[in-house]
């Protein structure tokens, strides 16, 4: 038995160097003992202490096995490094600027702004109502686009088409120049259009344009040149738009809320006969409506038709059939103009007395376009007698031949009558139009 013990101790010493070659089987350490003594070494743990003093060399096996977790952790560290190197999607989302509330709440408005650069490029004009159209960060620009979008009930395509037409029209018409540098004949347009601005106790401003159609002195002169009439109306409208000060806006208007950038219009039809409107008036009125509908959307808060005969109420009832509710709700016919000021209690004292207020007359306290007194063209009678001498030359010869037979006929007098007949025809046509 004593000879077997040295063999048992020598065998483990010889196998110690081989322990590192078995890193994945730490349970194999008990295998180094012989089959006969395995139960003695493993069961009575206290008794094994004296005999295991020779096994401290086996502890390096445990030390060698200790780095195993480190080797196993290496792939995890590599995965962490690879994951860190992969781009994260979060920074990309953070780079997108947050949309303003007026764009987030109204996707159609955002789409309209997406089309704005193409619109400005196609028209070559960027000014609208004194506002230089820019981007969605510019408050005045936002308000302009909201008006065009609202006028088309949120339809982006229709709003784009209208804005394009309006920009082209402003480029061609140059309405700013119609106010600043153009002049208008006082004989044709004097006393027909005014602009007033009233403020209530809180400082809120109300802009009013007045169209006094009953003040027309000569229908043919005022409405005969349709283009001239439209320019005069545009000039008055541009004066009112300038008073709205849209370019100075600092807050975006609510799409469905109050809009401070709107005006009132008053059309006075005192002494105007609705039953005898000549074609010139109808043509000028139609053209004006077309221009204003395209170029000035959502600038009208309310329109008052004053001094309208009660019998003409059917006209406004018919208008409701062809116009949208959003438009007709702004129209207010008033048979007696003196009742107009009642509609605005806070401004009653500032309205003209003729309209039920306590303020000065329009001729004294209101503004108007640049009027000039132009000399009226005096008809020159020279062209009328011109053909008479040429036609009268053969007449005396015929009279000389017939002196002995009969008295001369009044042919020389009949020739000038042709010129008079032309004048008479023109007057008759004018009278017919007036009727």
Swiss-Prot record:
Molecular function terms, GO-annotated: metal ion binding; phosphatidylinositol transfer activity
Annotated heme binding sites: 213, 233, 267, 269, 303
Biased composition (Low complexity): 10-19, 61-75, 83-99, 413-435
Gene Ontology cellular-component annotations: cortical endoplasmic reticulum; cytosol; endoplasmic reticulum membrane; plasma membrane
Catalysed reactions listed for this entry: a 1,2-diacyl-sn-glycero-3-phospho-(1D-myo-inositol)(in) = a 1,2-diacyl-sn-glycero-3-phospho-(1D-myo-inositol)(out)
Cofactor list: heme b
Subcellular location: Cytoplasm; Endoplasmic reticulum membrane; Microsome membrane
InterPro entries, per database record: CRAL-TRIO_dom (IPR001251), CRAL-TRIO_dom_sf (IPR036865), CRAL/TRIO_N_dom (IPR011074), CRAL/TRIO_N_dom_sf (IPR036273), Sfh5 (IPR042938)
Record key words, sorted: Cytoplasm, Endoplasmic reticulum, Heme, Iron, Lipid transport, Membrane, Metal-binding, Microsome, Transport
One biological process term in Gene Ontology: Golgi to plasma membrane protein transport
Protein's membrane topology: Peripheral membrane protein
Database matches in PROSITE patterns: CRAL_TRIO
Any Pfam family hit: CRAL_TRIO_N
Function of the molecule: Non-classical phosphatidylinositol (PtdIns) transfer protein (PITP), which exhibits PtdIns-binding/transfer activity in the absence of detectable PtdCho-binding/transfer activity. Regulates PtdIns(4,5)P2 homeostasis at the plasma membrane. Heme-binding protein that may play a role in organic oxidant-induced stress responses.
Family to which this protein belongs: Belongs to the SFH5 family.
Name of the protein: Phosphatidylinositol transfer protein sfh5
